[in-house]
Each structure stands twice: as C-alpha cells, then as structure tokens.
C-alpha cells in the first residue's frame, strides 16, 4: 500500500527518523551518485512521519542490532529520505521507480545492481544484502 502526502515540502529532504545504529545520511541524488561512483553499496529508504508501515520497519528490522552490525561489516551506506511533507526531490525519485508513495526501499549493490525491497522488511532480508 502506497501512501501519498497531503502538503508539499518547503525544503529539501532531511533525516528525522533513522534508527541510530544505521547512521543514515540525508538522501540527495548527488550523494547517491557519489556513493555509487565509489562502488559503495547503498540502502536508500524513503519514509514519512505519517507512514505506519515505515514506522514499524524503523522500530523493527531497521533498528535491529544484527542489521546495524551486518551493514557496518559490509560497508553498506544508508540514505534516508523524509517524505513527510512531499519533498519534490523524493517525489521525483519515487516516480522514476514507478512508485506513488512510501515506504520505498532500494538496495544498490557495489556492482551496480539495483534491488527493490519489499515494503515490510525483515532482519534476515536486510542482513543478507551486500
């Protein structure tokens, strides 16, 4: 189920809800391009304060210590986009992937492969990335 915001964002994406263990950076297309150019594996996740599925994932699988440890060991960077107010940069990223709303999770492997993850995340699914 995709959710759509009701008010436009006045500013660019900011990080507000990333689980502390993942050390997420704010999503920008430029930062994603930099990480991909350096062949760094990246998990991009788009969230919103009003998205219940997002919050379940953030308090569950994304907050799990095993996920944080696996990402650290594998050098996986995390970029979080906050779509709470309908940020147009995030809207464009979502639309480019045929998505109408959040949650949205995409893993970019070091070899360039892109994998869209399910809307409900699991610890096993996340620790298997990379």
Task: Locate predicted features.
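Proteins that catalyze or organize thiol-disulfide redox chemistry
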Residues: 1-130
């Amino acid at each position: 189920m995709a959710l759509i915001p009701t008010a436009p964002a006045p500013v660019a994406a900011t990080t507000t809800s990333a689980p502390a263990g993942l050390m997420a950076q704010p999503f920008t297309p430029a930062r994603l391009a930099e990480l991909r150019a350096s062949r760094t594996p990246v998990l991009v996740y788009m969230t919103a304060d009003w998205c219940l599925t997002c919050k379940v994932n953030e308090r569950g699988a994304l907050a799990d210590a095993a996920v944080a440890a696996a990402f650290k060991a594998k050098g996986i960077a995390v970029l979080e986009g906050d779509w709470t107010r309908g940020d147009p940069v995030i809207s464009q990223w979502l639309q480019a992937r045929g998505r109408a709303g959040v949650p949205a999770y995409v893993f970019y492997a070091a070899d360039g492969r892109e994998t869209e993850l399910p809307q409900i995340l699991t610890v096993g699914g996340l620790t298997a990335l990379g």
